[in-house]
Amino acid sequence: MKNNEKVSDSFLTSSGKELSEATPSASSYTTVVRDKNIKGVVSNWLAEMKLRHKPLGFDYQGVEILEVKPEDLTSVAIALYAYGFNYLRNQCAYDVSPGGNLASVYHLTKLDADVDQPQEVCLKVFLPRENPRVPSVFWIWKTADFQERESYDMFGIYYEGHPHLKRILMPENWVGWPLRKDYITPDFFELQDAY
């Protein structure tokens, strides 16, 4: 390198563009992720089918997030299965805030042999802390079996219609729901007391 050459602080992509030009800025990313007024393909289709839901925007990977009420979950889930979302990739739950609502979350994928990037959608069902009940989707996607049981075991969400809803990680006589934010951990628990 010669003394009078300026060293560039930027990096070039394989196309020769500066990395800053090729990569979306944080502000443009935030606009897509946080703008709840933008409806995605799945939300538009559900609206055409007159199925109640609320668009919540997109996650950081561009996956559409929809809120569904517990009483509408079965009809929306069946419609999405018919639309082609044939795989429940993940079902989980979380505690929104101490003393607040719980959420049951469903990550659905549209698997097709001809597609490199399968379409995905995320459903969220918010439930009251006292007596959180939601229909099981086990009858639509069998992969919900152990996942709904884990959500029941850790958060106390009751999945109505699940064929074998019981604790899966904790002993049957465990008191409370360990992953709730207001859960008080016991001082000790002896395993021999569980059997």
From Swiss-Prot:
InterPro entries: NADH_DH_suC, NADH_quin_OxRdtase_su_C/D-like, NADH_UbQ_OxRdtase_30kDa_su, NADH_UbQ_OxRdtase_CS. It is found in: Plastid, Chloroplast thylakoid membrane. It is an enzyme of class 7 (translocase). Keywords: Chloroplast, Membrane, NAD, NADP, Plastid, Plastoquinone, Quinone, Thylakoid, Translocase, Transport. GO terms for molecular function: NADH dehydrogenase (ubiquinone) activity; quinone binding. It is a peripheral membrane protein. One of its GO terms (cellular component) is chloroplast thylakoid membrane. Its EC number is 7.1.1.-. It catalyses: a plastoquinone + NADH + (n+1) H(+)(in) = a plastoquinol + NAD(+) + n H(+)(out); a plastoquinone + NADPH + (n+1) H(+)(in) = a plastoquinol + NADP(+) + n H(+)(out). Coiled coil: none annotated. Pfam families: Complex1_30kDa. GO terms for biological process: photosynthesis, light reaction. PANTHER family: NADH DEHYDROGENASE [UBIQUINONE] IRON-SULFUR PROTEIN 3, MITOCHONDRIAL, NADH DEHYDROGENASE UBIQUINONE IRON-SULFUR PROTEIN 3. Belongs to the complex I 30 kDa subunit family. NDH is composed of at least 16 different subunits, 5 of which are encoded in the nucleus. NDH shuttles electrons from NAD(P)H:plastoquinone, via FMN and iron-sulfur (Fe-S) centers, to quinones in the photosynthetic chain and possibly in a chloroplast respiratory chain. The immediate electron acceptor for the enzyme in this species is believed to be plastoquinone. Couples the redox reaction to proton translocation, and thus conserves the redox energy in a proton gradient. This is NAD(P)H-quinone oxidoreductase subunit J, chloroplastic. The gene is ndhJ.
